[in-house]
Amino acid sequence: MKKFLLLALAAFALAACNDDDTPDEFVQGDNTIAVFENDRLVFYDYDVFWEYSEPYTDPYGVTCIDLYMNKTRFVQNMPALDMEVPGIPIHPTPAGFEFDLRQAVPYYRGEPMPRYTLYDLEGELNGTLLELEFSCIGYDVEYLG
């Protein structure tokens, strides 16, 4: 029994000395955002909720949605903001829709936020599951919700 306790204590001491600064294991689930830099997870948040408007037809006959990004942070030190990306052209699919934009400027309180321009914005609604990915201020962002 003493050997077991000593081994357990040694294992605990080694684990406590871990100086790895990478985030804990991240499991992507509903209403989560994951942020990567050079394919390395640098930030994640389980407290986001993104939603979208009902599809509508813009003046040019294009079917669009507005994306609402509630409590959004693209990097850890960014304040959580409620932002909107209006007028995203969508392509209907049997299970929902998909979209692919080269870039989009989000809005905060009705004002454009060009500093947070979203690049290579891709997304898909499959049933009730919304998946998005894009790049912003040098980070790759993935949302699942």
PLM features: what roles do these ranges have?
Residues P23-A34, G61-Y68, T93-A104, L130-E131:
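Short, hydrophobic/aromatic-rich segments at coil-to-beta transitions
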Residues D47-P59, V85-P92, L118-G127, G145:
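Extended lipid/amphipathic-ligand handling interfaces
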